Regions:
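Small/polar-rich, solvent-exposed N-terminal microdomains that initiate assembly or binding
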Residues: 1-75, 162
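Extracellular/virion structural assembly segments
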Residues: 79-83, 91-114
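Oligomerization/assembly interface segments of phage tail-like spikes and tubes
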Residues: 80-96, 142-156
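Hydrophobic beta-strand residues in large extracellular and virion-surface proteins
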Residues: 16, 20, 65-67, 86-88, ...
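Acidic-leaning, charged glycine-interspersed low-complexity segments
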Residues: 27-28, 58, 62, 103-162
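Generic short beta-strand segments
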Residues: 69-72, 91, 132, 151-152
Length: 162
């Protein structure tokens, strides 16, 4: 029996997207205070990208969140489970590092840790915070962080949600 999607990554990606768009602080920082939660969808593909993709043609300053997932089937004696790793790349243009006198990257990382760290955000198990490291965006116009979480899906519960 399969759930909504036959692709586990797609299921998780949808949950991550919805969580990001429901966070008022993330919406405020990414939109520079211009969007409310009701307008949060406008951030998709402009400031929120559901894959590790940095468009060559970004001309605006501000902050961006990119995210992606990987999964692996782990087999142990008499047990098989899926381990999902969730990656967030937080990027901010060097001309706009601050929002309300705080570093944008720090604000966004804090919110990601609140929304995903040590929480059962996927309805299957706690997402464990793994790392927060410096990320080089490949261009000297953006400062970046790479935040990683790991979730172990012991029973493939995401697929059985209604």
């Amino acid at each position: 029996m399969m759930g909504k999607n036959d692709n586990l990554i797609e299921d998780y990606r949808n949950l991550v997207t919805n969580t990001l768009l429901a966070n008022p602080t993330i919406v405020e920082v990414l939109s520079d205070g211009e969007y409310s939660l009701e307008e949060a969808d406008e951030l998709m593909w402009t400031h929120i990208f559901p894959n590790q993709y940095i468009p060559d043609t970004i001309t605006e300053t501000g902050s961006f969140i990119l995210y992606d997932l990987s999964d692996a089937v782990i087999s142990r004696v008499n047990k098989t489970y899926i381990e999902v790793t969730l990656y967030f790349w937080v990027l901010t243009h060097y001309k706009m590092p601050k929002y309300n006198n705080k570093l944008r990257n720090d604000i966004l990382v804090r919110e990601l840790r609140k929304d995903f760290g040590e929480k059962d955000c996927f309805g299957i198990a706690k997402a464990h915070y793994v790392s927060n490291s410096i990320f080089n965006s490949g261009t000297n116009k953006y400062t970046g962080r790479l935040i990683t979480f790991r979730v172990t899906d012991w029973s493939d519960r995401i697929r059985y949600k209604d």
